[in-house]
Structure formats: C-alpha cells, structure tokens
Amino acid sequence: MSMFDKPFDYENGSKFEMGIWIGRQMAYGAFLGSIPFLLGLGLVLGSYGLGLMLPERAHQAPSPYTTEVVVQHATEVV
C-alpha cells in the first residue's frame, strides 16, 4: 500500500511516516543521479589507465601539429 492510497491525516505517526517516505525518495533520486556521474568517472579513469598501458614510445611521439607541417602546407599553396 502506497503512502498516497489513503487520505493523509496529520497525526504525529503519519508525519513521521511521511518524513521517512520523503527521505527514501530523496535517497533513491540521489542514487539514480549518481549512476551517470560514476559511469562518466569510470570512462575518464579507464581511458587514463589505458593511456598508461601504452608503450613508452607512444608517450614520446612528436606532436602532429608542429611548425614544420604548417610551413610545408603554406609553401605548397604558394
């Protein structure tokens, strides 16, 4: 039986039950909100860990955007 299946009466016991129900709903909402956050955090940490497992040669590769490449493209156009 749900909290709202009967008319709400304002006795002390009912107020306590309503507070418990509200707290459970808030905790459930926080749980649902934490799922995308934890998935995103896992994705970021997983990609970082994958980058750490790459060979050392991959860490020391030159940048693909060096000035030499830019100068070569500029001279080819002219």
Swiss-Prot record:
The keyword Membrane applies. Keywords: Cell membrane, Membrane, Photosynthesis. GO terms for cellular component: plasma membrane. InterPro entries: Intrinsic_membrane_PufX. GO terms for biological process: photosynthesis. It comes from the Bacteria. It is found in: Cell membrane. Pfam families: RhodobacterPufX (PF11511). Its main location: membrane. Coiled coil: none annotated. Associated with the reaction center - light-harvesting complex I. May play a critical role in facilitating the interaction between this complex and other components required for light-driven cyclic electron transfer. Belongs to the PufX family. This is Intrinsic membrane protein PufX. It comes from Rhodobacter capsulatus (Rhodopseudomonas capsulata). The lineage of its organism: Bacteria, Pseudomonadati, Pseudomonadota, Alphaproteobacteria, Rhodobacterales.
